[in-house]
Amino acid sequence: MNLIKGSLLASLLCISPLCNAHFDDIGAKTRAKIESIIDEYVSTHPEIIIRAMQKLEHDEQAIQANNVKNAGIALRNDNTLPQVNTSKAKHYIIEFFDFNCGYCKVLEPMFEKALKEFDLQIIYVNIPIIKEESSQSAVFAQAVYNVDKKAYFKFHKYFMTPGYKSSDTDTLKKLCKEYNVEFDKVLAELKSKRPHERITKSIAQSSNLKISGTPYLIIDGKELRGAFRDYSQLKALLED
């Protein structure tokens, strides 16, 4: 209400001799009189509030849609992010996820099925927001990706399997040995701070998209907050 009132006040000032005066420089009596006129107008024309709120919502949706579109273009071509296939694919899914997100884990089998059925690129953007342990596994996995891109997906599959997955040092060492990744190389990459910087950038990108939880998906330019009930929903979006 105050936002609408302020906009009307500014509009009235701009069609009056006071247009060139600063908003805060008008006299108290003049300001009070103008506000009284606005109050009376709004009270007798309540539809103006509805129209103003609808316009505000429409403008915010347009801004968000543009942000999603730009994010899709940028992330599809960002080789610092784990991805399956390239931006030449007809369809794409960008997933903002957390290794400790149960709903994200539910999506993994659906993604695997979609990759077999569609010309599809999948980009994984790790945003560790659920618990402190998520940050450790996210940064470590990013370091693995920087060292050995193929090996990363073995780590990804491990962490995205349903159930709790430890990310303590002993477990990570064991995984590196099992997946033929040199642990010392991963440690050296961690010391470079590049993995930390990538995860920090991902979190900043999620903030720009107003992401408040995982999973958050961008599918062929359209955003989707939350998981699918079943594969048919994902398939329908890719066939659209």
Regions found by a protein language model. Give the residues of each.
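Classical Sec-dependent N-terminal signal peptides that target proteins to the secretory pathway
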Residues: 1-21
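Short amphipathic alpha-helical segments that mediate assembly, nucleic-acid/protein binding
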Residues: 6, 30-31, 183
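Alpha-helical scaffolding segments of alpha/beta enzyme cores, especially the outer helices
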Residues: 9, 109, 113, 233-236
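Extracytoplasmic thiol/disulfide redox context detector
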Residues: 19-132, 190-191, 195-213, 219, ...
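Cysteine-centric redox/oxidoreductase cores and disulfide-bonded domains
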Residues: 129-240
